[in-house]
Amino acid sequence: MHELPIVKQILNVCLQYAEKEEAESIKSIRLCIGEANDLILEYVDKYFKYVSRGTIASEAKLELEMLPIICECNTCKEHIIYHLKGDERTTNCPFCGGEEFTMLNGGELFVDKIEIEKKENGI
């Protein structure tokens, strides 16, 4: 349920941009989400459809791009893709066997691209 306030903020950012650009509508939005955010993508999509109703983003296509978690091994300093879930869950560094990591990337959450349709002048 923590997705709803996040989606509201994302929509606000997009609407502010569209207003500044004098857009008639928002056609698509690409959202980059680091895997460490632990957002449920189905809820992000569902809530976006809900909160965008009645706005110029109501017909926008929401593109969700997942970004991997990149960590540095605290022992050997190698960079690895860290997996949080499933059979590939990372517990040890594949290079040295180290068990402690520093996260470098994977916590991101940002609007990467907004495609708008501009208003025609004078109409």
Language model segments and positions:
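Cys/His-enriched microdomains
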Residues: C71, T91, L109
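Short Cys/His-rich "knuckle" micro-motifs
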Residues: H83-G86, M103-G107
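Compositionally biased, charge-rich low-complexity tracts
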Residues: K118-I123
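Short, flexible, mixed-charge glycine/proline-rich loop motifs
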Residues: K61-I69, Y82-D87
